[in-house]
Amino acid sequence: MTKTTLLHEGKAKKVFLTDQSDLVIQEFKDDATAFNNKKKGTIADKGVVNNAISCRLFTLLEEHGIRTHLVEKLSDRDMLCKRLDIIKVEVVVRNIAAGSLVKRYGFKEGFVLQEPLVEFYLKDDDLDDPLMNDFHAVALGVATSEELAILRSRAEAINLVLRQFFADRKLKLVDFKLEFGRHKNEILLGDEISPDTCRFWDLDTNEKMDKDRFRFDMGGVENAYSEVQKRVLELD
């Protein structure tokens, strides 16, 4: 399978068409951004690490009956995927208070939520990806009520699988972002699952092991990403 035309280039990945109309190649970049592209930089070998982690986690979810866009890992940076019609809803699942949840509602960082929170955000960089509810999403025409129910249910199921997986590897899954898309009349999980899209804290020390280290100039970004990769793959 080879790349043909560049279909889309985002902050962290490029997506290429292939000689099969329903398949694309997702190429992971080392570019790093934060605060909706206001901060930019690079993280050495981030693309390699995120591809490896994402492929492993998509495979894990498939094993638990959760359908994803993954077809196979092609190379260190390339993932062969089913082509999706992306739903313009970013789904965020929160287990522990951090980030914007702390700023918006005054939770103390690290507060363990009684139940996981599932939030919807409009996928629109120009509007800074605003928080929205089901009524907003339907009014905007980005998803139907039925689709939103599927996204919420799917996100909750993914959270159950991933929380246990990471706990077994001495990591707290604080929160994470998911993207979904339509493919041949079904909704599949797309994008990636990585330290770019998740908050990971060490189970014993609460050390942050994700893109917050880049966001807030904490240093040790590459080491944190590599350590997450090591833990994700170490029991395979």
Swiss-Prot record:
Pathway membership: Purine metabolism; IMP biosynthesis via de novo pathway; 5-amino-1-(5-phospho-D-ribosyl)imidazole-4-carboxamide from 5-amino-1-(5-phospho-D-ribosyl)imidazole-4-carboxylate: step 1/2
PROSITE patterns assigned: SAICAR_SYNTHETASE_1, SAICAR_SYNTHETASE_2
A GO molecular-function descriptor: ATP binding
Listed EC numbers: 6.3.2.6
GO-annotated biological processes: 'de novo' IMP biosynthetic process; cobalamin biosynthetic process
Enzyme class (EC, first level): ligase
Record key words, sorted: ATP-binding, Ligase, Nucleotide-binding, Purine biosynthesis
Domain of life: Bacteria
Record Pfam families: SAICAR_synt (PF01259)
Catalysis performed (reactions): 5-amino-1-(5-phospho-D-ribosyl)imidazole-4-carboxylate + L-aspartate + ATP = (2S)-2-[5-amino-1-(5-phospho-beta-D-ribosyl)imidazole-4-carboxamido]succinate + ADP + phosphate + 2 H(+)
Spans traversing the lipid bilayer: none
InterPro entries assigned: SAICAR_synt/ADE2_N (IPR028923), SAICAR_synt_PurC (IPR033934), SAICAR_synth (IPR001636), SAICAR_synthetase (IPR050089), SAICAR_synthetase_CS (IPR018236)
UniProt keyword Coiled coil present: no
The keyword ATP-binding appears for this protein: yes
UniProt family annotation: Belongs to the SAICAR synthetase family.
Name this polypeptide is given: Phosphoribosylaminoimidazole-succinocarboxamide synthase
Source organism per UniProt: Chlorobium phaeobacteroides (strain DSM 266 / SMG 266 / 2430)
